[in-house]
Amino acid sequence: MMKNKEIIERIKSKKAFISDMDGVIYHGNKLLPGVPEFVEWLKKEGKKFLFLTNSSERTPRELQEKMSRLGIDLEENVFYTSALATAHFLAAQRPGGTAYIIGEAGLINAMYNAGYTMNNYNPDYVVVGDTRSYSFEKIEQAVNLVLKGAKLIGTNPDLTGPVENGIIPATKALISPIELATGRQAYFVGKPNPPDDADCPQADRLFQ
């Protein structure tokens, strides 16, 4: 069995690092202990690194700004979200497609930038991500669109997400009523699904 010192030295020898964010880098709006020192070490040692999040709410720019508010300055291209993974996956499946989206700016912007058009009438996909603006009307519309043939996609399979005062319902919890009402199972793109399902150009650039 390796001792702690051996484990630390083995970690230090790595050239690149990929880290989760929610519950690893921060919890809500609080950095977790050791994070500033870890990020500073990554920069000082010239390590390549990428921060991944299954949350689809924020854009990479918004994540960059959040980290800056918490006292850590990073480049925008070190963040990769489940919204980006979903957009890249769907763009590969059906380039220039259409989607009805239940989600926040992070998901809407990612889909738009991937060449998708928003469509509330006869979309190729109904895409559900993390959101705080959930409503019965949106569920009703999503249900009817799926019954008409739209494929149901979730940005991640998480039931809940951590916040400072507890947890919040995440994508799998939000998409469940649509699955139950339609009898259709959603396809989820984010972790822990295989990385082949979603291209990650940020990783390609950083780790080449």
Residues of each region from the PLM?
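HAD-like aspartate-dependent phosphatase fold
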Residues: 1-21, 25-208
